[in-house]
């Protein structure tokens, strides 16, 4: 599937392989 960086997530599994689910402000986003 196509990788969407900085998409909302609940856990690392929701992100691409190279991304981690990190809290940014009040939301969690897939980030490096």
Curated annotation (Swiss-Prot):
Any single Pfam family the record assigns to this protein: Toxin_12
UniProt key word Disulfide bond: yes
InterPro entries: Huwentoxin-1 (IPR011696)
Gene Ontology MF term list: ion channel inhibitor activity; sodium channel regulator activity; toxin activity
Record's subcellular location: Secreted
Tissues expressing the protein: Expressed by the venom gland.
Keywords: Disulfide bond, Ion channel impairing toxin, Knottin, Neurotoxin, Secreted, Toxin, Voltage-gated sodium channel impairing toxin
Disulfide bonds: 3-16, 9-21, 15-30
Main location: secreted
Keyword Disulfide bond recorded: yes
Cellular-component GO terms for this entry: extracellular region
Similarity field: Belongs to the neurotoxin 10 (Hwtx-1) family. 60 (Tx2-9) subfamily.
Role: Blocks voltage-gated sodium channels (Nav). Causes tail erection, scratching and a reduction in mobility at a dose level of 1.40 mg/mouse.
Domain remarks: The presence of a 'disulfide through disulfide knot' structurally defines this protein as a knottin.
Protein name stated in the entry: U5-ctenitoxin-Pn1a
